[in-house]
Amino acid sequence: MAKVLVLKSSILGDYSQSAKLIDHLQQHWQGQGAEVTVRDLAAQPLPVLDGEIAMGLRGGDELSPRQQEVLALSDELVAELKAHDTLVIAAPMYNFSIPTQLKNWIDLVARAGVTFTYTETGPKGLVEGKRAVLVTTRGGVHKNGASDHVVPYLKTVLGFIGIDEVETVYGEALNMGPEANEQGISQAKQSIEQLVA
């Protein structure tokens, strides 16, 4: 049975376009018997990386209670990622980039010696044998353009930790009028259905 980890990161709750697409994807995967775990990074926000947390993520014997708590949370997030075959990331574009909530997850998961390591030939990802699906929504049209700092960034981060098989579902032009919105959502749903077929 396929095991799918879904990360939602929209701050818009029921109004979220990316969450609606993720729900569509989740229904299709569950219909095929997949086990789906959903982590809503906006509803259950993670701590923001700061100096104390950064030092704590390195481990050690003399950690503050806060550092111990965040290190345990980071270990939990990494274990959750490694326990699933497929990672699905809902990544709406906010001001040309990803939501803060998603960046917080990345900062707690991308850890030297845990999800990647440095070798004589350069960095090597340690989260191997996984597949990722990015579901990204935008008010305008940014696919493959210089203004898209969502997909290239996420592909770089995922590749850095060892996840090289990455597919992307785009929902674009969603704020460019009702017709454009309907068309953008429809095309994204078609991409989802092809992806899970």
From Swiss-Prot:
It comes from Shewanella loihica (strain ATCC BAA-1088 / PV-4). Homodimer. Its cofactor is FMN. One of its GO terms (molecular function) is FMN binding. Its EC number is 1.6.5.-, 1.7.1.17. It catalyses: 2 a quinone + NADH + H(+) = 2 a 1,4-benzosemiquinone + NAD(+); N,N-dimethyl-1,4-phenylenediamine + anthranilate + 2 NAD(+) = 2-(4-dimethylaminophenyl)diazenylbenzoate + 2 NADH + 2 H(+). Belongs to the azoreductase type 1 family. FMN binds at residues 10, 16-18, 93-96, 137-140. HAMAP family: Azoreductase_type1 (MF_01216). SUPFAM superfamilies: Flavoproteins. Binds 1 FMN per subunit. Gene3D superfamilies: 3.40.50.360. Keywords: Flavoprotein, FMN, NAD, Oxidoreductase. Quinone reductase that provides resistance to thiol-specific stress caused by electrophilic quinones. This is FMN-dependent NADH:quinone oxidoreductase. InterPro entries: Flavodoxin_fold, Flavoprotein-like_sf, FMN-dep_NADH:Q_OxRdtase_AzoR1, NADH:quinone_OxRdtase_FMN_depd. It comes from the Bacteria. It is an enzyme of class 1 (oxidoreductase).
